Amino acid sequence: FAMWDSDVNEYNIVDATPYGRDVMRELKDACDRHGIHFGVYYSHAFDWGEANGPGNDWDYENPGGNLGLFGGLKWYDEHPELLPRIRTYINRKSIPQILELIKKYDPDMIWFDTASKLPPEECLRILKKVREAKPDIVVNSRITYPYPFPGRTGHFGDYLSTGDRAVEFLPRDGDWEAIPTTNESYGYHKHDHSHKTPTYLIEVLAKAAAKGGNILLNIGPRGDGTIDPVDVNILEKIGDWMKVNEASVREAGTTTLTVQPWGQSTLDGNRFYLHVFDWPEDGKIQVGGLETNVKAARMLADPDQTPLTHQRLDSMTVEITLQGSTPDIGHAVVVMDVNDASKTDDTRLVSTKIETLLHGFDSRIIGADYKYGDGKARRDYIEVGRNTDQKLVWEIYLREPATFEVSAEYQRIEEPGVFTVTCGTFESTATTEGKPVDEWFSTYIQQDMGRLSLPAGKHTIELAPAEARPDALMRLRALHLKPQ
């Protein structure tokens, strides 16, 4: 369904609804008036309302997903006889409407979606037409289905779009963007009351910025065009936080520091922005892995820019005494200027006071044949156990001796399998527990792995499968270290 006045197909908001207004034109004109770049969404590969389109209402019982596609996800390999019909759809509707959008509305960006529903060569044919029509238009990676390179996945877009609703992120090369929603729906859903808090979404924004990513936050307008008051409140609260802390995410990006006990950091030149998700009880944070000298520190929200007291505790750790308290919405940000931000150590400081979550996405990944979750809730995992050469490694350090309860957070895959967690002389072997994975509704379990006592200094924690399975042993989310 076209949300603009389309001359290509009469199934559009002007010709097919009583509303009769070209909202695309109105949005484009408003963006031009306010100096905002204008982008459009176009589902080039999935069309419920077109007889020749993949996933249409006539041929499939579930137009919203892959299960009803003839032959499954790669239906075009199973049923090549359908390709002429699909090519007709692309030639008569998909490409003409895309070119129409470019000509009539001159968007700065086209956000494509559901490329897996088309053969790759058809997606590339569409991309070629787009580049010919407007060479400098920005196109996301969902124009085509990803393809494998040795050690990585490639795409033909100008930047990478993550999976839907990702809130945890693997380290990535190049430009990328995550697309979380305020609840669990992209369109308006009156029964979906799973809205995240503004504070949660601000943390997602900071975590993405720390790894060089952008956030495209989705809300679903109601049928009359108004925005759900719950969404309005979320956006206003995020806006309030951004008015004070904008520089920490808009001007800053990929950090050279590792994950911290209290949160994350972003970096602009030799200026770190320390995002304090968990305000310490004693009002002091320890910055781990920092080998350069600190020149100055202050609270970003402090209009007087009062210097914060800081001291070096050892060659890798600096302690900063905070001022004020954590805000009601969002989190506090510390500005920390240093001599040389490249002088850091990836060894992660582990707190002896609060629980540490060693996320799989933040591990050093050894071996091959891994599969990764897309980062959304309950799907932020690494599949471990396709071969016994696989290993997830976390390098940590402690400033004082401590004892921890260790637990593994994961989802079991198929039959129980054996894995180990080791750290120096500590070795804990366990058999996976819980119910086998249900693709969409699985929850993680936390399995006790025993008590780990460590002296001050550097240590290496490893998780590895003790046996291999074709479908892996587990979907590992994290290891937990709880001080005793």
Regions found by a protein language model. Give the residues of each.
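A short tyrosine-centered beta-strand micro-motif
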Residues: 404-406, 459
